């Protein structure tokens, strides 16, 4: 019973569970229905998404359909769509464009001939100054006296002596030395004149004013000032102007007037100023204005050649000068016009290569990097590099056969010297091992680094085929010819390149290579090379034209180069990508481009101005070095002179030039002769050093030293000071002798015997290497009393108003008390200003006009570019 009951209960439970499950299902269905009805009736928006599994299946279906459509598209692609793919690939492989350094170009173009600056005043070292007069008791009188003093009386701080002061003065004279003086331009009205007369310059007028207003001026002098005026001799085109000058200043200005650099200007001079090749070029039509006045003048530019030979052992300097020339040349090379449409050309190349659909063939690389910007960039780079003699380096991918075939044209047209050897060897080796040797079934060339022969030279000996060997021989011997034209060394291209005949030689070699069997290479390889050669050979006519165009533009611009074209490998190189050479070969059209006359004249003017400035700065530096040697400035740092020389050339970053090149440059400058005018000016200064020293407030003619205190003496110009005006009664020793021998025993003995010693020779008042410091360092025990146990540097024998123990500069007011000192400055009296001795008449031309830009008189035009002819009297571009 129990068992049965248990079983019955189990069955009952199962039945109950089933019923419960059914009820739950019914409830769930009802709920679902309720939710659906609610969703339908509700205004809320809900996003219903599929389950993840369904999404995955849908994605797979989409992927499969996409793949199928892709395959269909690849098969059915039109040439236009294919072209777009190629274009996209080109965009991915961008060619770096040249970014000109605007600052360098501006520096070059801003160099103007300094001769053109107008002089507004005469050159002066001295000026008259009023100084008070002191009575015997030290009181200042109301009267004044006029003395000649230096205008710029500045001694720089530091280790500096009087001879160096004179060297600086000489440098200042060279900087201010005018190349011409036209007194009419600087003349000003004399305010005190009776009949509105003029004096030579504003400084003369101001001196006249000051003297006229001075109460102590004599009546005769005032009357003379009232009569001062210019005297004109119109028949001789001459004018005389009154001037007030120190005799030394008069000597300077008279010399400048007699040695002016201006020369008469006429049409023949302008005609001969234009480079001869441009004058004789039938493509340029030049006309000149015939209305030049008889008073026209010009300053002949200084275009001496090769005095420093910067190309020889001056790597940094040569690199800088060629870089600036390269940037200038690029700015004047004309832009190519009417290039073949990139899209059309790539489409045509695709047809020639039979690239109807994208394949994984090496030919697809042939089309990469082709664009008009790269073609124009390549054209400018080649011409500018040859003009400036900048070394180029080649960038290429060995697997891009089209680049290498274009490189064969490049090596045919551009001489080997223009490429850095490592880059040239790599390119030649790639051409030999990729194209030439495989064509004849020869083994790869294993080139040893450092081999004196280049790969093409080795290949020339091993290739039996005449046409290929003949082309290799031409490339191996492709060098610039050095020709002197108008006194300038020019690097001229081979005649076969100038007339374009060499391209036929190249094509013969290429056709021979394309006919070979490539026995050791697969068929695809042979076909790729042949198709690449076909692409280039299809443009035979355009390549001949391109070569002629390149040579013509190079030679026309070369006519405007005024400095010798020395070829030496440069430290840095200009990069040239072979893909851009391919662009140039494939896109060159039939439009001729030649430099405009305005561009040529601009290029010529910039070259002339730089060259002339370069020579003038050399003359200055040589003169300063000679002056330093004549002044016995053994300790003068010559490097500073060379640095100044380079700074004045504007284009050099002087701080980065290595020291060894600085000293080599100094040695070269030392060997050059001094220009006559600069030598004469130095001799004028040397003859008058004593007068200049006297006029300075900071240069003394000696110093007196003693153990015992010396009384201050009355001086008419300064009152009671430690200044001695004569050396009567003093033992004298020459400072130059003392410094040269270094023997101080004589001074020591005198001082021990209480005898004052006068050291005679020019010395600055304030200097860290003064004579007293020098002597005191020799024997501190003997000279302890002189330096009074103070720092040597603080002992400055300058015009003490009280005594050397005081830093204050009070005038002496207590006449009963006489202060003393242990040092005296020996100073000679400066030259007194005497109006009659300072009045000079200066003579110059009444009037003339200096023209700096001679080419402004020339109006120029060109023939229609399509009719432009090359040196052989045939059109530059024949393929129309």
From Swiss-Prot:
Residues covered by region (Hydrophobic): 394-414, 422-442
Chief location: virion
Cellular compartments annotated: Virion
Record-marked site positions (Interaction with the intermediate capsid protein VP6): 220, 224, 228, 839, 841
RNA-binding is among the record's keywords: yes
Region span, Disordered: 1-43
A GO molecular-function descriptor: RNA binding
Superkingdom to which the source organism belongs: Viruses
Basic and acidic residues bias: start-end ranges: 19-30
Region annotation (5-fold hub) ranges: 1-80
Cellular component GO terms, alphabetical: T=2 icosahedral viral capsid; viral inner capsid; viral nucleocapsid
Keyword annotations from UniProtKB, A to Z: Capsid protein, Inner capsid protein, Repeat, RNA-binding, T=2 icosahedral capsid protein, Ubl conjugation, Virion
Keyword Repeat belongs to the record: yes
Modification comment: Sumoylated with SUMO1 and SUMO2. Sumoylation of viral proteins seems to have a positive role on viral replication.
Function of the molecule: Inner capsid protein that self-assembles to form an icosahedral capsid with a T=2 symmetry, which consists of 120 copies of VP2, with channels at each of its five-fold vertices. This capsid constitutes the innermost concentric layer of the viral mature particle. It encapsidates the polymerase VP1, the capping enzyme VP3 and the genomic dsRNA, thereby defining the core.
UniProt free text on domains: The N-terminus binds RNA. It is necessary for encapsidation of VP1 and VP3. The N-termini of 10 VP2 molecules form a cylindrical hub underneath each 5-fold axis of the inner capsid.
Family per similarity comment: Belongs to the rotavirus VP2 family.
Subunit structure, as described in the record: Homodecamer; each decamer is made up of two conformers of VP2, called VP2A and VP2B. Interacts with a VP1-VP3 complex. Interacts with the intermediate capsid protein VP6. Interacts with NSP5. Interacts (via N-terminus) with NSP2.
HAMAP family recorded: Rota_VP2 (MF_04123), Rota_VP2_A (MF_04127)
Record's protein name: Inner capsid protein VP2
Organism field: Rotavirus A (strain RVA/Cow/France/RF/1975/G6P6[1])
């Amino acid at each position: 019973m129990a068992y049965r009951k248990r079983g019955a209960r189990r069955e009952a439970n199962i039945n109950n569970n089933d019923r419960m499950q059914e009820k739950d299902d019914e409830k769930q269905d009802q709920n679902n229905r309720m939710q659906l009805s609610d969703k339908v009736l509700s205004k809320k928006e809900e996003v219903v998404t599929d389950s993840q599994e369904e999404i995955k299946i849908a994605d797979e279906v989409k992927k499969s359909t996409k793949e199928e459509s892709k395959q269909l598209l690849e098969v059915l692609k039109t040439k236009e769509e294919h072209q777009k793919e190629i274009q996209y690939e080109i965009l991915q492989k961008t060619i770096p464009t040249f970014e000109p350094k605007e600052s360098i170009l501006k520096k070059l173009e801003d160099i103007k001939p300094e001769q053109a600056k107008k002089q507004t005043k005469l050159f002066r070292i001295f000026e008259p100054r009023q100084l008070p007069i002191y009575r015997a008791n030290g009181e200042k009188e109301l009267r004044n006296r006029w003395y000649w003093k230096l205008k710029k009386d500045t001694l720089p701080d530091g280790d500096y002596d009087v001879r160096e002061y004179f060297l600086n003065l000489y440098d200042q004279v060279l900087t201010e030395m005018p190349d011409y003086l036209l007194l009419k331009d600087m003349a000003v009205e004399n305010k005190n004149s009776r009949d509105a007369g003029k004096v030579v310059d504003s400084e003369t007028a101001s001196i006249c004013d000051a003297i006229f207003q001075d109460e102590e001026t004599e009546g005769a002098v005032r009357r003379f000032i009232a009569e001062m005026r210019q005297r004109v001799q119109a028949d001789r085109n001459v004018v005389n102007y009154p001037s007030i000058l120190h005799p030394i200043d008069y000597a300077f200005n008279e010399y400048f007037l007699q040695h002016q650099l201006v020369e008469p200007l006429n049409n023949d001079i302008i005609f001969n100023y234009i480079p001869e090749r441009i004058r004789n070029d039938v493509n340029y039509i030049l006309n000149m204005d015939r209305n030049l006045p008889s008073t026209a003048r010009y300053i002949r530019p200084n275009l001496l050649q090769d005095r420093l030979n910067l190309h020889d052992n001056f790597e940094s300097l040569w690199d800088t000068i060629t870089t600036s020339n390269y940037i200038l040349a690029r700015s004047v090379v004309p832009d190519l016009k009417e290039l073949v449409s990139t899209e059309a050309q790539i489409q045509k190349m695709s047809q020639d290569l039979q690239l109807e659909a994208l394949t994984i063939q090496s030919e697809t690389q042939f089309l990469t990097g082709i664009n008009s910007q790269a073609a124009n960039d390549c054209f400018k780079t080649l011409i500018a590099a040859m003009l400036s003699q900048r070394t180029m380096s080649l960038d290429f991918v060995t697997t891009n056969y089209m680049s290498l075939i274009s490189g064969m044209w490049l090596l045919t047209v551009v001489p080997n010297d223009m490429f850095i050897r490592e880059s040239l060897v790599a390119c030649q080796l790639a051409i030999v091992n990729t194209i030439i040797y495989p064509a004849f079934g020869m083994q790869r060339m294993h080139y040893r680094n450092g081999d004196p022969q280049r790969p093409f030279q080795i290949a020339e000996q091993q290739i039996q085929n005449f046409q290929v060997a003949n082309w290799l021989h031409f490339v191996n011997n492709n060098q610039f010819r050095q020709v002197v034209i108008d006194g300038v060394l020019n690097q001229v291209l081979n005649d076969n390149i100038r007339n374009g005949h060499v391209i036929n030689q190249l094509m013969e070699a290429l056709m021979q290579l394309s006919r070979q069997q490539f026995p050791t290479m697969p068929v695809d390889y042979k076909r790729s090379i042949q198709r690449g050669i076909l692409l280039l050979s299809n443009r035979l006519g355009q390549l001949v034209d391109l070569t002629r165009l390149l040579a013509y533009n190079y030679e026309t611009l070369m006519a405007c180069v005024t400095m010798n074209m020395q070829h030496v490998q440069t430290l840095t190189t200009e990069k040239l990508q072979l893909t851009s050479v391919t662009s140039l070969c494939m896109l060159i059209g039939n439009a001729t481009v030649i430099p405009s006359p305005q561009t040529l004249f601009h290029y010529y003017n910039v070259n002339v101005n730089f060259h002339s400035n370069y020579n003038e700065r050399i003359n200055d530096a040589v003169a300063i070095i000679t002056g330093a040697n004549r002044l016995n400035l053994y300790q003068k740092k010559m490097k500073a002179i060379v640095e100044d020389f380079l700074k004045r050339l504007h284009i050099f970053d002087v701080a980065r030039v290595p020291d060894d090149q600085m000293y080599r440059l100094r040695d070269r400058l030392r060997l050059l002769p001094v220009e006559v005018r600069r030598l004469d000016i130095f001799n004028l200064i040397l003859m008058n050093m004593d007068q200049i020293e006297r006029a300075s407030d900071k240069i003394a003619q000696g110093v007196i030293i003693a153990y015992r205190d010396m009384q201050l003496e009355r001086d008419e110009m300064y009152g009671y000071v430690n200044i001695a005006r004569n050396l009567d009664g003093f033992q004298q020793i020459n400072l130059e002798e003392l410094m040269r021998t270094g023997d101080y025993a004589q001074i020591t003995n005198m001082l021990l015997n209480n005898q004052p010693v006068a050291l005679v020779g020019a010395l600055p008042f304030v200097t860290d290497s003064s004579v007293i410091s020098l002597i005191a360092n020799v024997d501190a025990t003997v000279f302890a009393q002189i330096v009074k146990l103070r720092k040597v540097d603080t002992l400055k024998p300058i015009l003490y108003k009280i005594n050397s123990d005081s830093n204050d500069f009070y005038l002496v007011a207590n006449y009963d008390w006489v202060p003393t000192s242990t040092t005296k400055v020996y100073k000679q009296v400066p030259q007194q200003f005497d109006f009659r001795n300072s009045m000079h008449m200066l003579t110059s031309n009444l009037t003339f006009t200096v023209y700096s830009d001679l080419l402004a008189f020339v109006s120029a035009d060109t023939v229609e570019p399509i009719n432009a002819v090359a040196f052989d009297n045939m059109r530059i571009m024949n393929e129309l």
